[in-house]
Amino acid sequence: MAKIIAFDEEARRGLEKGLNTLADAVKVTLGPKGRNVVLEKAWGAPTITNDGVTIAREIELEDPYEKIGAELVKEVAKKTDDVAGDGTTTATVLAQALVREGLRNVAAGSNPMGIKRGIEKAVAQVTEKLLEAAKEVETEEQIAATAGISAADPAIGAQIAKAMYAVGGGKLNKDSVITVEESNTFGVELEVTEGMRFDKGYISGYFATDMERLEAVLEDPYILLVSGKISNIKDLLPLLEKVMQSGKPLLIISEDVEGEALSTLVVNKIRGTFKSVAVKAPGFGDRRKAQLQDIAVLTGGQVISEEVGLSLETADLPLLGQARKVVVTKDDTTIVDGAGSEAQIEGRVNQIRVEIENSDSDYDREKLNERLAKLAGGVAVLKVGAATEVELKERKHRIEDAVRNAKAAVEEGIVAGGGVALLQAAHVLDNDLELSGDEATGVRIVREALTSPLKQIAANAGLEPGVVADKVSQLPQGEGLNAATGEYVDLMAAGINDPVKVTRSALQNAASIAALFLTTEAVVADKPQPAGAAGMPGADEMGGMGGF
């Protein structure tokens, strides 16, 4: 495909125009009085959202240079979302401010490489200042405030804080699994699952012990974990006899249980001879093996697998796991109070954390995080309902963002919200870091850009941005504008805070992309095809569908 090339100022201005188009659509959502954006979908109802990265992903521009500029800013939003789970709009606003001021100085004759170095040094200093100013999250109220701001609903923030405590063993835990599900009921309900839950239920409905609830409840069972299929009852019989003699029920988790092995278990369950439940192992392939091993560690058992030289025929009771209780429905299995040793569980948790750090795949990281949380302390489910499908999607998305926001707060602490932490951290740049020339210009660009989130929040609230920024810059540390009321207050005391991880990630990612913009000297893009060039021959004459 033929290419078109733009150089120098033309290249940078094309990129900037794309950035501005995207940023202008995103920044109207910032702050408590920010607006929503409606996104048309190819099918189904439109989506209404105030999430920066969701809006950014939907924007596709026609001009090739503008399209590249927009794609670069999408990367800012996406990277911030990946790292911190929120702050995508703040990152976009910062990127726009840095690029605008930077390009103005480059056009006036400044050296872009010098400006880039100045920006990088300034961002490093501001990041250090933010981390110093961060306060650890110590109470449920602080988490509720942080999550409530992100979700734009204090009641939802309180539910998220309650969920984090419930699955964190009575303390805040960033590894807690909190899932958000759509519900037919109205409002938000919290359901906490103690222990480990995975999404596989009993293989046969005959295993149910409570026909009203359609669930099988096993008290103090043995747990048999098998990596392959079980079909031959002769392989299983020696172990079954030993379990029967112990008087305990048996949970079997394997790739599958079929044929005479399944029918024998069902018949004995119906007759009341022996209580057991067979469940398919969760996941597929290598992920299934890993999850089986997780369950083995949690329950104090071993996975029966030829790979480690173990077979069903020779298996004995010490190889089986145990738990205080197991509840199996048609859809999922919950293991409560596994008998695994704390040291082994902690070792497994640390191993999964290392895998998360080394993974390049978002999907793999998500699955590893799920495994981590199941081992680290249970699962909380927030069930979300709303009057319409459009409202339900918007609400669910908002709550998912708030959950990630809360976890980020636990991880690195919180700072004053409302764009105030960035503006007040800018004081470390007052002497231009004792730099000179173009590097000092880069520092001044960052100092000016740090006021942009607060100014945008003020603008969205109908206030004069410049006046608000001047007023806040003169206030004591941590005091600033409560845009919801228009008052100037101690933000931390008022529960208006942001996770420092979100704030610093937004700044670092915005600065990274801004530096690329400023140092760009040429842009190579695909040459746009003339309208209709990609269509079928004769499409114009035949209505585009061969005359049909």
Curated annotation (Swiss-Prot):
The keyword Cytoplasm applies. InterPro entries: Chaperonin_Cpn60_CS, Cpn60/GroEL, Cpn60/GroEL/TCP-1, GroEL-like_apical_dom_sf, GROEL-like_equatorial_sf, TCP-1-like_intermed_sf. Disulfide bonds: none annotated. It comes from Corynebacterium glutamicum (strain R). Its EC number is 5.6.1.7. It comes from the Bacteria. This is Chaperonin GroEL 2. GO terms for biological process: protein refolding.
